Design a protein with these regions (language model features):
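C-terminal, charged low-complexity interaction regions
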Residues: 145, 150-165
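Short amphipathic alpha-helical segments that predominantly mediate membrane engagement
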Residues: 1-144, 162-165
Length: 165
């Protein structure tokens, strides 16, 4: 049984379902708790940090978002679709890249091409992270720091390590 999680559209963690019960007493307690929750004690519809709508299912396939011990997923495990917080961060990074006067249009295109690779652990992730790091050296601070902050929330641990975050 998959343990579900609730996040807001911007990616703030809201809650996780209780772990599955292990014995009959726990099953009964969980059933009573669910009954009580259905009588009015539900999660808020909106995030208390930012006011965005809370979701517990994928917008595309409607399957529940799997809880992964506090590690926010970037993509749906059922259909592979990016979650809204992933789309939002990548969109903001692309928009910000277009504003960087230090880069040519070819460089901007190449930098934007690294973003998707930085959100998944593949054989191309270290290469994309190395390219990203080079572009950050080229644009310099504070632009590089701003762009790093935008993408940091959706990068894999391997990408963060290579980039130095």
């Amino acid at each position: 049984m998959i343990r579900g999680a609730t996040y807001c559209l911007k990616g703030h963690f809201v809650s996780a379902e209780d772990p599955p019960p292990r014995d009959w007493d726990q099953i009964q307690e969980a059933a009573l708790r669910e009954f009580d929750e259905d009588q009015g004690r539900k999660l808020p519809a909106f995030c208390t940090d930012c006011g965005s709508e809370n979701i517990s299912t994928c917008n595309r396939c409607q399957k529940k978002i799997a809880f992964n011990n506090g590690r926010r997923p970037q993509y749906c495990g059922w259909c592979g679709s990016p979650f809204p917080w992933t789309v939002g961060a990548l969109s903001a990074a692309r928009e910000y890249t277009d504003e960087l006067d230090q880069l040519s249009s070819e460089d901007k295109t190449a930098l934007k091409a690294t973003f998707d690779e930085l959100t998944t652990d593949t054989a191309r992730t270290p290469l994309a992270a190395t390219h990203f790091k080079r572009f950050m050296e080229k644009v310099g601070s504070p632009a590089a720091e701003i762009l790093k902050k935008i993408v940091e929330t959706v990068l894999t641990e391997a990408a963060k390590k290579t980039i130095g975050l």
